[in-house]
Structure formats: C-alpha cells, structure tokens
C-alpha cells in the first residue's frame, strides 16, 4: 500500500467463598453493550501477528508501589460540574488529596455529549465542558500543583460527519489525517453498514472486528495501518501537545488488547487503564494481552472489587467483602495470582455507568453506606478512583481517609489481611511503608469492633467506618482543612434529622426528605422479600400517600410513612411527580432522601 504522507498532504492507507485477601490466624445513554454484572467471556481475536515497539522502563502500564489516588471528575450528564473552568477553580482543595484526575473525553462530538460519540481528535476542542484554551489551562494548573490529568480515550468506535462512512479531515504537525470507509470493520453494525456502503459505492475493510461490536457508531478496524497511524498521532497530541499524563481507554473489549500494546509502546503514557467490564479472568487476560517483553502496558479497572463492595453495602452483609462475586475474586485479591495483579488494579466503588441516573435509568448503584464503601476503597491496595458525586457529598471525610492512607504509606501493591468478618462489620489490616499499618473496620456495627492489640490507635471514624493506625501516631497525620463553606453534611444518624421526627413505641415507620422538584405529594411503596407491594401497602402503585410532617433546615419537605402491618417490610421506595428512589432496604425509623438512607431516628 502506498503511504501518502508529506507536509500538508492527506495521510491514509487503503487497507462461596473464602476471603480474597490474606487470612489472619486470630438519556443520552452511551449504549455500550456491557453486562450489568459480567461473567468471564473472551471475545474472539482474529488479529494478525503484530510486533509492537519495545517499551522503555516508563511504559509499564501503571507504576509499581504507586501511592497515588485518582478522582473521576465527572458523572453522567455532569455538564455543569465538570466544566474545565469549574474543575480548575477547585485545584486548591484537590491538591494533596488527588494525584490523578480523570476528565471526560475533551474533543468536540458535534453536539452536547459526554464524549463517547467522539468525532474530532485534533482540531476542534470546543466541547460540552469548555473550549481548548480552558482545557489547556486546567491541565497546566493541575500540573503546577502536582496533579496529573488522565484523558478519556475512545478509539473503539468513531462518529461520522455526514453519512455512515465519512470522517473528519484534520491536521496535526503539518500532516493531514483522515479515516476512510475501509477503516471500518467488515461486520460493523451486524452487516448494516456494509449493506449501506455497497448500495452507495463504498467499501469497508475485509477484516471483521477483533473484539465485541457496538452498533452505536462505526467500529474501527485496528488492523488498518491508517487507523494505527492516526491513533498513534492522536495519543501523541493528547500527551505531548495538550499535556495529558495518561489514558483511560474506553470499551477495550471492542478490539484486541494487542493494539493497546502497540499504542502505548508508541505513546509511552505514564498511566494507562482500560475499561474491561467483565469477570476477573477476562480482565486479567486483557492485561496480559497488553504485554510487551512480558510486561503489561496497561492497568484495568477492578470491576469485581466494585461488585463485592456493592454486595456488602446494599445487602447490609459485610462478610461479602471477603467473598467472590459470582465466582470472581477482585484483582487485588491474593487468590488472583497471589496478588500479583494489584499493581494493575484501579479500584472503584461507583462510576458513570453504575450510578443512579434517574428513575428511568437507575443502573446498579450503591444504595447506601457511601462513606463505608469509600473507607474500604481507600484502605485497600490497588489505585483507588473516587467518584465525583461521592467527593462532592463527603469532601472532608474522604480527604481525611486519603490523608491516613498516604501517611501510612499504602500503595497499589500493599498487602491486606482479614482480621474479622461477620454480617455487622468487616475488619482488614493493610501494611504500608516502614511497617506502618492501617486497620479499616466497616459495617453497621463497625464501632463495636475492638482491635486485639492496644498498639492500634483510632485516628478517624464516621458513619459505619473506623480507621486505626499502628506504627505512627495519629497526631502525626495532618488532615486537610477544607473551607467551611465546602464542608459536606456528615453521613450520620445524628446529623440533618429534624427534631420533629419521632418514632412511637412499637411503631413501624420511615421518613423521607423530598427534593422540591418531587412535589407536595409523596407516595410510599413497601414490600416483603418474595412478596408484593400492593399486598403490603394495601393499594396499587404508586402506593400509599405519606404524611408531610415538617420542613428540614434546607427547605425540603419531610414526610413520614407508618405501616399498618404488624411486621416491618424488607424494602421501601418513595416516589413523587414521576420521580422515585431506587429499591432501598427498609430500616425502622430510617431517615431517607433521594440518595438513600441518611440515618435512623432515635439513634
């Protein structure tokens, strides 16, 4: 094939379980076809043999013994909160807590977008989050404050300009790049693209997709030399022109892992993490598939870590932190190659695909115990990634957790040991640097756990979590002081519950603080496990009307529902004006808002 590459010329080619850690002796949906709760499945790989450039020492996918913490600085439709200027204005409070900040895909997508329908790669950075000048200012300001920015990289697929097969023509370093119809996989969109192309005089690649397909846009043929050339140039632009330190690769199951090896070998990012949303074996195989010289060139998100935390929090059974999720241990587990994948595990407890978006797009969220979930996340090995909504709600407490983590010297390769496990609490010890240790206890009765040794000293505690340290004095740990106006409401049964909320003797009831947009009428739907809501509340959906009993300090109306049954329900939903909560575990006297249980009246 002829390379048409010269200055100002177009460049294209035609072509059950035991604990997973050491044991102690004492709508604008992105449409990605990811399973809600993945099990292992390995996509077919028809990639021809490739010989990527040999990586240097810096091209190791993710640093060993890395003690940094990452922030995912967006959620779904966070068009206001994730503006480049808004994020830059928060630099002071992010500094010291977060070492990496992952931001949305920053190119123009041809309209309001979260970035997963990527269109322009080089020449148009007026996105839904700001313009190119604001983006560069954000990255440079972060860099000046020792915060590195992670780019969201979407190269599995690409949006078209005006028809099914045309792409933008863009110039970078005096070279013009343009993808063509033969850069689209032969079996794109189940054959619909090929049918359209044939009818309109175009040809697609002769190669089928090397991974899973996605019908939303054109899946790129990464065997195409033109695609590889343009992707390499794109990554060079992100890293060496815009100033990103690393990449978060979207939907990496859509193409062979060997291409990530090629691209990272060429671009040499300091950090690389792939979204391989699947079971642990598939994630591990993907990491292995990025190897060059037997060295992985990328980390991956530890989805199974997230699912174990979800299982424990949502089911109020903290033993599940020490159990497999549908036969999958987390990557950080000792049962996954003796813990050898911890270096390449980016852990998290919520992201934009799992969060609660709306009543009609509830996803698979954490329903309660956000603080306990983050306390566990920030105590464990792997590189923790905190979700923006969680940071916004609990900045001071999360910042304190990170401060303890860093003071103890916990890294992505630290060794955890299970110290206690029962339904009410789970305790894990993690060894940091210089034999300093952190003991994290989470669960509904976390405060009732007493460490076996008096050498443990409590350093911080909150709603359903306690941190103890050993080998370092609590007074030696400096906690950040966020501006008072930015302090979040504490997630505690004693904070934020109005005094007019009371529970009578033997009364089965719950309280709901409703957002003003939910209207003046709130209904309650409750049910027993295996039972029917209509049977329990005595009426059809949307249930029985709750009584408005007062106004909270923030102006929201507070409603009370009292059961007429002798037995408490297992689950509850509040709804109003077309909005509704997720299915929530019923707690007698529980004080809820749209995010879940905030506390218990009288406790």
Which residue stretches match the model-derived regions?
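Aromatic- and acidic-residue-enriched segments that line the glycan-binding/catalytic groove
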Residues: 112-122, 157-203, 265-266
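Structured interaction patches on ligand/partner-binding surfaces of diverse proteins
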Residues: 578-603
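Active-site-proximal helices and loops of the catalytic beta/alpha 8
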Residues: 51-76, 86-95, 105-119, 136-147, ...
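Boundary/entry segment of secreted carbohydrate-active catalytic domains
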Residues: 52-83, 213-224, 509-513, 518-523, ...
């Amino acid at each position: 094939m002829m390379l048409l590459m010269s200055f100002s010329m177009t460049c294209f080619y035609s072509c059950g379980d035991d604990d997973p850690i050491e044991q102690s002796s004492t709508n604008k949906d992105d449409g990605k076809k990811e399973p809600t709760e993945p099990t292992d499945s390995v996509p077919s790989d028809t990639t021809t043999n490739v010989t990527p450039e040999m990586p240097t020492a810096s091209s190791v996918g993710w640093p060993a013994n890395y003690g940094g913490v990452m922030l995912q600085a967006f959620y779904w439709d966070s068009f206001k909160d994730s503006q480049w200027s808004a994020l830059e204005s928060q630099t002071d409070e992010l500094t010291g807590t977060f070492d990496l900040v992952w931001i949305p895909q920053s190119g123009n997508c041809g309209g309001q977008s979260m970035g997963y329908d990527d269109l322009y790669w080089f020449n148009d950075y007026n996105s839904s989050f700001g313009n190119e000048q604001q983006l560069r200012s954000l990255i440079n300001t972060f860099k000046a404050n020792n915060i590195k920015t992670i780019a969201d990289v979407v190269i599995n697929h690409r949006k078209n300009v005006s028809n099914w097969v045309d792409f933008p023509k863009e110039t970078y370093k005096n070279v013009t790049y343009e993808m063509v119809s033969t850069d689209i996989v032969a079996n794109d969109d189940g054959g619909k693209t090929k049918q359209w192309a044939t009818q309109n005089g175009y040809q697609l690649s002769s190669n089928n997709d090397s991974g899973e397909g996605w019908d939303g846009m054109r899946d790129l043929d990464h065997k195409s030399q033109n695609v590889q050339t343009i992707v390499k140039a794109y990554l060079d632009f992100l890293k060496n022109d815009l100033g990103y330190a690393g990449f978060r690769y979207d939907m990496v199951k859509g193409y062979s892992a060997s291409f990530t090896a090629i691209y990272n070998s060429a671009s040499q990012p300091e950090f690389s993490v792939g979204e391989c949303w699947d079971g642990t074996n598939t994630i591990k195989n993907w990491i292995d598939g990025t190897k060059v010289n037997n060295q992985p060139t990328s980390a991956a998100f530890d989805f199974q870590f997230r699912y174990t935390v979800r299982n424990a929090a949502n089911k109020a059974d903290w033993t599940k932190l020490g159990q497999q999720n549908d036969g999958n241990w987390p990557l950080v587990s000792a049962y996954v190659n003796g813990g050898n994948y911890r270096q390449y595990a980016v852990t998290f407890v919520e992201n934009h695909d799992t969060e609660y978006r709306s009543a009609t797009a509830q996803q698979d969220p954490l329903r309660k115990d956000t603080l306990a979930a983050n306390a566990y996340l920030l105590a464990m090995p792997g590189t923790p990634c905190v979700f923006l909504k969680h940071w916004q709600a609990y900045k001071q407490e999360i910042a304190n957790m990170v401060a303890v983590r860093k003071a103890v010297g916990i890294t992505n390769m630290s060794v955890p040991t299970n110290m206690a496990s029962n339904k009410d609490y789970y305790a894990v010890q993690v060894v940091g640097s210089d034999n300093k240790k952190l003991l994290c206890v989470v669960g509904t009765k976390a405060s009732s756990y007493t460490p076996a040794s008096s050498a443990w000293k409590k350093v911080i505690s909150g709603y359903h979590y306690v941190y103890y340290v050993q080998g370092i004095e609590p007074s030696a740990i400096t906690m950040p002081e966020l501006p008072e106006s930015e302090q979040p409401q504490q997630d505690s049964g004693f904070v934020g519950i109005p005094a007019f909320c009371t529970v009578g003797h033997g009364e089965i009831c719950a309280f709901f603080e409703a957002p003003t947009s939910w209207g003046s009428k709130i209904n309650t739907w409750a049910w027993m496990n295996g039972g029917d809501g209509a049977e329990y509340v005595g009426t059809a959906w949307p249930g029985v009307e709750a009584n408005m009993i007062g106004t909270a300090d923030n102006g929201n109306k507070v409603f009370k529902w009292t059961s007429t049954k002798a037995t408490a329900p297992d689950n509850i939903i509040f709804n109003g004006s077309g909005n509704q909560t997720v299915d929530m575990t019923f707690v007698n006297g529980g004080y809820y808002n749209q995010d879940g249980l905030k506390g218990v009246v009288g406790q």
